[in-house]
Structure formats: C-alpha cells, structure tokens
UniProtKB/Swiss-Prot annotation:
It holds the Pfam family Oxidored_q4. Its EC number is 7.1.1.2. This is NADH-ubiquinone oxidoreductase chain 3. Keywords: Electron transport, Membrane, Mitochondrion, NAD, Respiratory chain, Translocase, Transmembrane, Transmembrane helix, Transport, Ubiquinone. It is an enzyme of class 7 (translocase). Its main location: mitochondrion. One of its GO terms (molecular function) is NADH dehydrogenase (ubiquinone) activity. It is a multi-pass membrane protein. Core subunit of the mitochondrial membrane respiratory chain NADH dehydrogenase (Complex I) that is believed to belong to the minimal assembly required for catalysis. Complex I functions in the transfer of electrons from NADH to the respiratory chain. The immediate electron acceptor for the enzyme is believed to be ubiquinone. It catalyses: a ubiquinone + NADH + 5 H(+)(in) = a ubiquinol + NAD(+) + 4 H(+)(out). Belongs to the complex I subunit 3 family. PANTHER family: NADH-UBIQUINONE OXIDOREDUCTASE CHAIN 3 (PTHR11058:SF9). It comes from Oncorhynchus tshawytscha (Chinook salmon).
C-alpha cells in the first residue's frame, strides 16, 4: 500500500510541476511569427481562420454514429452462445431499426445534401 501511495504522490507532484512550468515558460507577449499559420515551411495559400461548413460536422457526426453501430454489432455472432439468443437478436434488430429510422429522418430533412 505504501508503494502505491508513493507512486500516486510522485505522479500528482510531477503533473502539477509540469503544468505550472508550461504556463510560466512561454513568453507573455506573442509576436507575429507565433500568430501566423505554418504550412510545411511554405507561405499559407489562404486564410487559416476560415470557418468549416456546418454540413461537414453533420456528416462527420453521422459517420461516427454509424461507425459506432458497426462496433456494437461486431460481437453479434458470439451472441448466439448466450442463454437467450433470441433476446440478442431482438436487441440488435431494435438498434438497427432505430439507426435506420434516424438515417431516413436525416435523409428526408436534407441533412445529407452537401450542396444547398
């Protein structure tokens, strides 16, 4: 128990010291070089402060949603080894139906249209 306490104390102390140094170390007044964007040693082609399209974020969130669906359904073949494989089938069908209804809703609302 004493070893765990020592390791936790060292970890917290080291983290606090490094966090404090990271706030004190940089200069207070930033110059133009630090505020300019850097693109592999070349001058930037356009403004680096242009906002992204909201449609991009919507497509990205939908991709993550369906990627998570696949991650949840990958262990499904091992579900038939449970005591009640029909319950596993019912739950997986419910998840697929819910996500399919969500996709149909996004499609009908025009959320998947990239150009307006």
């Amino acid at each position: 128990m004493n070893l765990i306490t020592t390791i936790i104390t060292i970890t917290i102390t080291l983290s606090a010291v490094l966090a404090t140094i990271s706030f004190w170390l940089p200069q207070i007044s930033p110059d133009a070089e630090k505020l300019s964007p850097y693109e592999c040693g070349f001058d930037p082609l356009g403004s680096a402060r242009l906002p992204f399209s909201l449609r991009f974020f919507l497509i990205a969130i939908l991709f993550l949603l369906f990627d998570l669906e696949i991650a949840l359904l990958l262990p499904l073949p091992w579900g038939d080894q449970l005591d009640t494989p029909t319950l596993t089938l019912i739950w997986s069908t419910a998840v697929l139906a819910l996500l399919t209804l969500g996709l149909i809703y996004e499609w009908t609302q025009g959320g998947l249209e990239w150009a307006e």
